[in-house]
Swiss-Prot record:
UniProt name for this protein: Probable nicotinate-nucleotide adenylyltransferase
Gene that produces this protein: nadD
GO biological process: NAD biosynthetic process
PANTHER family: NICOTINATE-NUCLEOTIDE ADENYLYLTRANSFERASE-RELATED, PHOSPHOPANTETHEINE ADENYLYLTRANSFERASE
Source organism per UniProt: Thermotoga sp. (strain RQ2)
The UniProt record lists the keyword ATP-binding: yes
Pfam family, one: CTP_transf_like
Pathway linked to the protein: Cofactor biosynthesis; NAD(+) biosynthesis; deamido-NAD(+) from nicotinate D-ribonucleotide: step 1/1
Presence of keyword Transmembrane: no
C-alpha cells in the first residue's frame, strides 16, 4: 500500500490558529521530511465545542499557511459531516495518498488518548507524532500505562509549545494584545473576533 509519500495530518480546533501551530508545522515538515502536511480543522469535535465557526477558522488557516510550501489546509471534515473523529480523517487520507500517514498531536493528548474513538486503530493506521507542550513526563507515564510500548511513537525534538488557544481567547476577551501569539496576517481580526 505504501507509495513512499510522506504525509502528515495535523488536526485540531485551531480556535484560533496561533504561532505555536505554525512552529509545529515548520518543525514537522523538517524533522519528518514530509512531502505534504495536511492541516485539518475539526468540524464537529466530539469532546468540546469551538467558539469560532468552522468557516472562520478555515479562513484564518488559509491566510496563515497560504505561503508555506508543502502545506495544504483541508475542509475534509466539514464535507464529511457528522462528528469529527480522527480515525475517519486518517483513513480518508491514507486511501487518497496510498500511504500510512503521520498523525500529529500535542503531548497533552497522551493524557487522554485512550478515550479517543477507535484509538487503537489510530495507532495501527498512522504513525503517531507528538510535539512537546508544558511538562511531558506525567503524560508519558500515563501513556505508557495505557498504551504500553511507546517505541512506535515519534516524539519531536523541538521547542516546547506553551501557547494555547484558550489563553489567546482569554487575552482577547480582556483586551490584551495578541502580538506574538497569533500570526500577524490575522492578528487584528482575531483580536476583534474574540474581544469583549
Amino acid at each position: 500500500m505504501n507509495t513512499g509519500n510522506r504525509i502528515g495530518i495535523f488536526g485540531g480546533s485551531f480556535d484560533p490558529v496561533h504561532t505555536g501551530h505554525v512552529l509545529v508545522s515548520v518543525y514537522t515538515l523538517e524533522i519528518l521530511d514530509l512531502d505534504r502536511l495536511i492541516v485539518v480543522p475539526v468540524f464537529n469535535p466530539p469532546h468540546k465545542k469551538t467558539v469560532a465557526p468552522f468557516e472562520k477558522r478555515f479562513e484564518w488557516l488559509k491566510k496563515v499557511f497560504e505561503g508555506m510550501e508543502k502545506v495544504e489546509v483541508s475542509d475534509y471534515e466539514k464535507g464529511r459531516g457528522g462528528v469529527s473523529y480522527s480515525i475517519f480523517t486518517i483513513e480518508y487520507f491514507s486511501e487518497i495518498y496510498k500511504t500510512k500517514p503521520f498523525f500529529i498531536v500535542g503531548e497533552d493528548a497522551l493524557s487522554y488518548f485512550e478515550k479517543w474513538y477507535r484509538y487503537r486503530d489510530i495507532l495501527e493506521k498512522s504513525t503517531l507524532v507528538v510535539y512537546p507542550r508544558y511538562c511531558g513526563k506525567p503524560y508519558h507515564e500515563h501513556a505508557r500505562r495505557v498504551l504500553g510500548d511507546l517505541s512506535e511513537i515519534v516524539f519531536l525534538d523541538m521547542p516546547i509549545v506553551q501557547i494555547s488557544s484558550t489563553e489567546i481567547r482569554e487575552r482577547a476577551r480582556i483586551g490584551k494584545t495578541l502580538k506574538g501569539f497569533v500570526p500577524e496576517e490575522i492578528r487584528e481580526e482575531v483580536e476583534v473576533f474574540y474581544g469583549a
